[in-house]
């Protein structure tokens, strides 16, 4: 009878070890996925910052052209 109990205990211990091993593998996969997603977020942030700088530059150019156009229109009205 004690051999039966020992075998059941051994089976439960083995099952626990298998479960722990699977969970460790899953944790590693999730860590890799998390690192990958973190890198994607960082890349997206850099792209956003670059686009914001470009947008500001284009707005400045647009304002410059609008000022020139207003000046030309003002000269045309004077004539």
UniProtKB/Swiss-Prot annotation:
Renumbered residue ranges of the record's region Disordered: 34-65
Subcellular location: Cytoplasm
Keyword set, alphabetical order: Acetylation, Cell cycle, Cell division, Coiled coil, Cytoplasm, Septation
Xref: InterPro entries: Cell_div_ZapB (IPR009252)
Residue stretches of biased makeup (Polar residues): 35-45
Biological process annotations from GO: division septum assembly; FtsZ-dependent cytokinesis
GO cellular component labels: cytoplasm
Coiled-coil residues: 3-79
N6-acetyllysine PTM positions: 8
Name of one Pfam family that matches: ZapB
Ranges annotated as biased composition (Basic and acidic residues): 46-60
Main location class: cytoplasm
Family: Belongs to the ZapB family.
Role according to the record: Non-essential, abundant cell division factor that is required for proper Z-ring formation. It is recruited early to the divisome by direct interaction with FtsZ, stimulating Z-ring assembly and thereby promoting cell division earlier in the cell cycle. Its recruitment to the Z-ring requires functional FtsA or ZipA.
Subunit structure: Homodimer. The ends of the coiled-coil dimer bind to each other, forming polymers. Interacts with FtsZ.
Protein name: Cell division protein ZapB
Organism name: Shigella boydii serotype 18 (strain CDC 3083-94 / BS512)
Upper classification of the organism: Bacteria, Pseudomonadati, Pseudomonadota, Gammaproteobacteria, Enterobacterales
